UniProtKB/Swiss-Prot annotation:
InterPro entries: EF-Ts_dimer_sf, Transl_elong_EFTs/EF1B, Transl_elong_EFTs/EF1B_dimer, Transl_elong_Ts_CS, UBA-like_sf. CDD domains: UBA_EF-Ts. Keywords: Cytoplasm, Elongation factor, Protein biosynthesis. Its main location: cytoplasm. NCBIfam families: tsf. GO terms for cellular component: cytoplasm. Associates with the EF-Tu.GDP complex and induces the exchange of GDP to GTP. It remains bound to the aminoacyl-tRNA.EF-Tu.GTP complex up to the GTP hydrolysis stage on the ribosome. GO terms for molecular function: translation elongation factor activity. The gene is tsf. It comes from Anaplasma marginale (strain St. Maries). This is Elongation factor Ts.
Amino acid sequence: MKVGVEAIRELRQITGAGLGDCKEALETCSGDMEKAKVYLREKGLSKAYKKSHRDAADGLVAVRVEGDKGAILKLGSETDFVARNEKFRSLAAELVSSLLKHGAEDLSSFSASPYDGGSGVSVADEVVNAAAVLGEHVVLSGIGFLELGGPGVIGSYIHGAVGEGIGRAGALVALEATTAKTEALLEFARQLAMHIVAAKPESVSVETLSNDLVEREREIVAKQVEALGKPESVASKIVDGRMQKFFEDMVLLEQTFIMDGSTKIRDLLHNKGQDLGCEVRIVAYRLFSVG
């Protein structure tokens, strides 16, 4: 099967594999992008097992925290020109404020809720109206809402800020802690949110990581190791070692804290708990980025 140059380039951008390898993968998989990714992984030519948090060509991420609640959303645009437009920024800010107020946890219910900007229409209709004014496609492509169920804090971080709480990437993280809301705990939550933006974990713990994702990765790793021709006892240890590295990349608690490059997040939580005299636990997080 003949595949297009654009598809080859897209696969290369996603996987980091060579152009020739990407062409071979797409031809072998009849142009199926997802199957081609797996093909390259099995050949040991790609490490692209993380899902993308960027499904819009451009746009902005907006985040807002008030007390024990936090909201985050991704507003997509076709170009950077529109993303820098003041009306687009204002829309993102107004939408995230509305999300914080309504506390919606899924995109469809929030889109159907009343827009709080005074226009008397739904959130979805306001986005359509904005697109007409701005002259290109605008899409509300993701939302996140966190609310504490007990003592703790919610931290946030925006990367590439273009305004207060608005930028190119952002994260919310909810921490459970029985101590009072100290500046130290709030700063710790902010640092964790910063880490999440940089490290892009897929789950809080190994237990909450998708079973399908884990099994698919184990199958891919097993095929890679099988090609080495090692004895079964040795191959099994190699598979376990590679899976541990997989977890260290994908799981927040297993990741190494970006700000010191040595401490695992789970150990960081333990250390902070000792400093504060209480247990500190990550309840949940939300992450979005564009561009």
